[in-house]
């Protein structure tokens, strides 16, 4: 996996040793692999199960298993900085938008407008577009980035406002 903004040079600037919580994609992937029964803990070590060993070298099968675990089994709300619930949020619809509309670079506000009914968001922290963007960041774009299914525009970095980021399918 290649995770944007999680390159070794950047991570080791502040720490000489990294733990999973210092590296969110790894921490979540570890949890997903435990939940999907691809890893187990024994004597303080994470070891692959039979199913996990069977997936070694089969990137497509591993990606599909982690995708299912993330979008069907994991409580993504636990990883949100500002938990937001939208009654009309539908992950199947979100994934359809990604499949059909992210062939070229799409700015986050446009993606948010396609995924969520922005005009129906009446209670918000910053603005309807900002709240929808944060919601999609934790529930859709970040997981798909970590799974390698979409990419963030190369000119965007950690300091780029979420509303100014652009994404496309890989």
For the regions a language model picked out, list residue spans one by one.
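DNA-recognition alpha helix
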Residues: 1-7, 107-123
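Short, amphipathic alpha-helical interface elements at domain boundaries
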Residues: 1-28, 54
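Conserved aromatic-histidine-acidic binding/catalytic patches
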Residues: 14-25, 44, 58, 83-86, ...
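Short amphipathic alpha-helical interaction segments
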Residues: 20-35, 42, 127-148
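Accessory beta->alpha helical hairpin/"wing" motif in late/C-terminal subdomains of nucleic-acid enzymes
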Residues: 27-29, 36, 40-79, 151-170
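Intrinsically disordered or highly flexible coil/loop and linker segments, enriched in small
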Residues: 39, 104-111, 149-153
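Leucine-rich, amphipathic alpha-helical/linker segments
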Residues: 58-115
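A compositional/structural signature marking long, glycine- and acidic/polar-rich segments
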Residues: 118-140, 148-164
